[in-house]
C-alpha cells in the first residue's frame, strides 16, 4: 500500500490531510466535530466519494466518543445522532457513499438491543455501536480497493492478452488513489495493480480543471509511487488518442465514480463525459472503478442525479505556492491570482453524467460488470440482496 494517507484515525482522534496544500506541503487538520468535517468536505480539503464518507462517519464518532451527546435516553441519543448525520450529508449530496454511510449508521443505532438496560447504559451501547460501525467503514474500504484493483487488472488482461512486449497505456481523470480513499484507490488502484503485475507501460493523468485534482493530486501520487506517467490538460485527450494510440498502445480510460445509478449511468468529476465520448470514437475501452457502495439502485437513470454547482471563483482565480527566482518553491508563501476577467459569467458544475452507452465495464470489489445482450448492466447478478 502507498505510504500516502489522507486519513489518520485512532479512537477519539481524527486527522485529515489538507489536500489543498498538496503537492508542496503536507499538513493534517485535526477534525473533532461534525462542523469541522462539513467544512473539510465542502472546501474540498478532503475529496473522493469513499474518503468523504469515511471522514463524515469518523468525525461523528470522535464527537460522540468525546462526549458531545448529552441525551438522557436512548430515543434522544438516536435523535441527536440522526441530526448529526443529516447535517453531514448536506456537505456533498452527490456522493452516494456518504448517503449509504448515513443510512447504515442510522440503521446501526436503531438495531442496538437496549432491553433491560438503564437509559444511561442504552445510550452508551448506541454510541459504542455507532463508533464500531464507523471504524468498520474505514477498514472495509481498504480491502475493497485492493479487490477493485485486482478485478480491473484481470479484465484488462483478458481483453488485451498483455505481454512484456504489449504492455498497455491508460489515462485517468481527477484523483482516485490513496488520497481519495483509505488507501490504494479505485481507478488509480487498478493502475497500481497493473504496474505491480508488470502490465503497465505508461499512465496519463488529466489536469482536471477547474480544481486541478489531476495535476495537484494524481500527478503527485504517480510520481510518489514511481509509476511512469505524464500530465496533460483536459483538452489534450483527443489529440493524445489520435496521435499516440497505436504508438503507446493506449488501451483504456479508467475513472472513478461519485455515483453509479441502476442503469449504469455514472456521475463523476466534470470532464469525465467528454473522455468517454472520445474513448468510444477512438476504440478505447472506458472503465468505471467504484465500490458497490457507490452504486445507487434506487435512482433509475443519470437524469435524476443532483449536480452540485461550484463557486465562480474556481474558474476565475487560482492559488499556488510562490516560485522563487532560482526556481525553488517557497511553501511558506501562497498567492491568489486572477486568471479571467472577474466580471465574466461562470457556469461551474462539479460533476457530469456519463451515459451507460459509453461505458464498457464497471469494476467493483465483487467483480467486473459488463453489459448483457440487452445493452444493460445487470447489477442484480452481482448483489442480488440489493434488488429484493
From Swiss-Prot:
Q: Which Gene Ontology terms describe the biological processes this protein takes part in?
A: L-methionine salvage from methylthioadenosine
This enzyme catalyses: 5-(methylsulfanyl)-alpha-D-ribose 1-phosphate = 5-(methylsulfanyl)-D-ribulose 1-phosphate
Q: Family assignment?
A: Belongs to the eIF-2B alpha/beta/delta subunits family. MtnA subfamily.
Name recorded for this polypeptide: Methylthioribose-1-phosphate isomerase
Which locations, inside or outside the cell, does it occupy? Cytoplasm; Nucleus
Q: InterPro entries from the entry?
A: IF-2B-related, IF-M1Pi, IF_2B-like_C, Initiation_fac_2B_a/b/d, M1Pi_N, NagB/RpiA_transferase-like
Q: What are the record keywords, sorted? A: Amino-acid biosynthesis, Cytoplasm, Isomerase, Methionine biosynthesis, Nucleus
> Kind of enzyme, top EC level?
isomerase
Tree of life domain: Eukaryota
Q: Which NCBIfam families match?
A: eIF-2B_rel, PRK05720.1, salvage_mtnA
Q: Name one GO molecular function term.
A: S-methyl-5-thioribose-1-phosphate isomerase activity
Kindly list the GO CC terms recorded for this protein. Answer: cytoplasm; nucleus
EC numbers: 5.3.1.23
The principal localisation class reads cytoplasm
Pathway of this protein? Answer: Amino-acid biosynthesis; L-methionine biosynthesis via salvage pathway; L-methionine from S-methyl-5-thio-alpha-D-ribose 1-phosphate: step 1/6
Name the Pfam families on file: IF-2B (PF01008)
Which residues does the Swiss-Prot or TrEMBL record annotate as the active site? 258 (proton donor)
Q: What does this protein do?
A: Catalyzes the interconversion of methylthioribose-1-phosphate (MTR-1-P) into methylthioribulose-1-phosphate (MTRu-1-P).
Is Membrane included in the keywords of this UniProt record? no
Position of the signal peptide: none
Which pairs of positions does the record mark as disulfide bonds? none
